[in-house]
């Protein structure tokens, strides 16, 4: 975590590290059980599912400067979607160009032992799906370390819907502690589609940490990722890739 000076009043803005990279802490929001995220008409809202009441309007998933970065990318030759943050240590992905949406993407993990050394590292291990424009990722995440939503020297899980770094929103389910040796399955399921909008559920089977996201763009890039900050060991690995 760190601070950057904001223009104007000379205040400081706290920057936190999410599974989608760094961003202002004020852009990280909890979506509790019984609520869902709606992206209808390009605006993200927190909705009480039973009553369909709008609880909060967040605005676009990405702020202006992030959308500008996307525009710059679109001016280059078209390439495959890539990591939403440069903190991905290793990853592998698959682009869906079948003409049919991905309706299920699941990964089973056996939670590993604690890291051999403790150097305040923050680890995120996840399967995820991005849209075609680099702008958002939906992801069931296993974490080690202290993240902006909690944690410490133990493993825990949460589901995230995250925009691009620096200015994008990061919406998440509650964080749930888990134990080394446990088998967990992170799943993203297509729950509906209508008029070019798609709805998904990101979840861990058997855990109360679901994150429903409705009426967003299609997610076409499926990826498995290890993301890390704060560890010199992982920086060395990346230098030798």
Where are these regions (language model features)?
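Exposed, interaction-prone regions of secreted/extracellular proteins
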Residues: 1-241
């Amino acid at each position: 975590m760190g601070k950057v000076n904001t223009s104007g009043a000379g205040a400081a803005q706290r920057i936190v590290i999410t599974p989608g990279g760094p961003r202002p802490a004020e852009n990280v929001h909890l979506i509790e059980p019984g609520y869902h995220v709606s992206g209808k008409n390009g605006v993200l809202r927190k909705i009480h599912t039973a009553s369909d009441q709008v609880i909060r309007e967040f605005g676009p998933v990405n702020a202006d400067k992030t959308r500008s970065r996307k525009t710059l990318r679109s001016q280059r030759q078209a390439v495959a979607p890539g990591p939403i943050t440069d903190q991905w240590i290793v990853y592998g992905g698959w682009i869906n160009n079948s003409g049919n949406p991905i309706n299920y993407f699941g990964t089973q993990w056996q939670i590993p032992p604690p890291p051999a050394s403790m150097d305040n590292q923050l680890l995120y291990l996840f399967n995820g799906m991005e849209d075609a424009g680099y702008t958002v990722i939906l992801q069931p995440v296993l974490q080690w370390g202290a993240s902006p939503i909690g944690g410490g020297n133990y493993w825990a899980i949460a589901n995230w819907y995250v925009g691009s770094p620096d200015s994008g929103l990061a919406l998440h389910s509650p964080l749930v502690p888990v134990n080394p040796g446990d088998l967990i399955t992170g799943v993203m399921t297509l729950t509906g589609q209508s008029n070019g909008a798609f709805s998904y559920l990101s979840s861990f089977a058997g855990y109360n940490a679901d994150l429903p996201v409705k009426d967003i763009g299609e997610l076409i890039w499926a990826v498995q990722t290890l993301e890390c900050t704060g560890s010199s060991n992982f920086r060395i690995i990346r230098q030798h890739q």
